[in-house]
Amino acid sequence: MKRNVFYGALLVLLLGFLVRENRLIHITKQVEKTEESAEWQPEWYEQMAEEINDSPITLEVDGTMVDPQLGSLRMSQDGQFMIPYGMLPDTLSCAALLYDGNRLVMERGNTHAEMTVGSPELLLGEESQTIAAPPEWENGILYVSLEAVTEVFSYEENWDAENRKMELTGSEDPATFLPESYDYRKAGRAPAVKNQGSLGTCWAFASVMALESRVRPEWNVSFSEDHMSLRNSFHFSQNAGGEYTMSMAYLLAWQGPVLEEEDPYGDGYSPDGLSPACHVQEIQVLPEKDYEAVKRAVYLYGGVQSSLYTAMVSDRDNTHYYRKETGAY
């Protein structure tokens, strides 16, 4: 009986040894180096990209975590990290403007760079460079090479694979991020000049044109001041005047904006059943008289609306600032 137990135990040990040795041999074969296995195979990038893109990537810029609601990086099929161009103003404090749906212009301070969708060329100032991953559209979002962006604006990249975090560290002084001068007309961001006439709709014109400048040059559109001033929830006449909180309420309630062609200005009539041309997701209210914040907002995002409070009772009055002959301040 004891001998049978002994042989049984010996058989188990022998089988265990064979299984272990076979596993060791299998592992050895996996890591055995050959000329063929030393080359990085394209399908490996695809597998890695699929795994990395399976959940959001955390982005940290100069030690500050980027709000994930702004968007997320992704990896292309050839192993390049890509960033939505719409994230650039908030994350890297640069203007990012899309012309004709395919030409991306990035600016910060005195730095000017251009890329074209599908093209490997990066134009940095007057110098042309080749980038590994051209800008590409994915699910309606334009992605640009993170490597190209960090090259343009002098950032160091560090990929923390364990925590799925990309860390960017800049070397430029934030005080140099704004240019010495900036002209919306030259940048193609200035909306067309409009005529308010004699109605008390200055607040609507200011809000609508600030919004128009926000979506330019990607979307050259004219929104309706008539709809904002007649179809808001305050039910004032167009001669009653208004102010910025009324336009904020109208836009954030998604009552508008509608297109100017659907509701032209000045006829006193606004048709029923018009749908918003876009949905405003966020409005920033800047600190009073913070002129640097105003400059930054104009450069990165679009025109700003300002409010003027006065003791004037009507437009028939004259003050230091208002001239009834011209109807202007």
Label every PLM stretch briefly.
Residues 172-329:
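Catalytic-core signature of thiol
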Residues 1-3, 28, 32, 185, ...:
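Generic cytosolic/nucleocytoplasmic N-terminal low-complexity/intrinsically disordered segments
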Residues 6, 13-15, 26:
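N-terminal intrinsically disordered, low-complexity tails enriched in polar/charged
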Residues 14-22, 214:
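Hydrophobic membrane-targeting alpha-helices
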Residues 20-180:
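Primary recognition of N-terminal secretory signal peptides and signal-anchoring hydrophobic helices
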Residues 2-5, 60, 181, 261:
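Intrinsically disordered, low-complexity peptide-like regions
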Residues 1-11, 21:
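N-terminal Sec-pathway targeting helices
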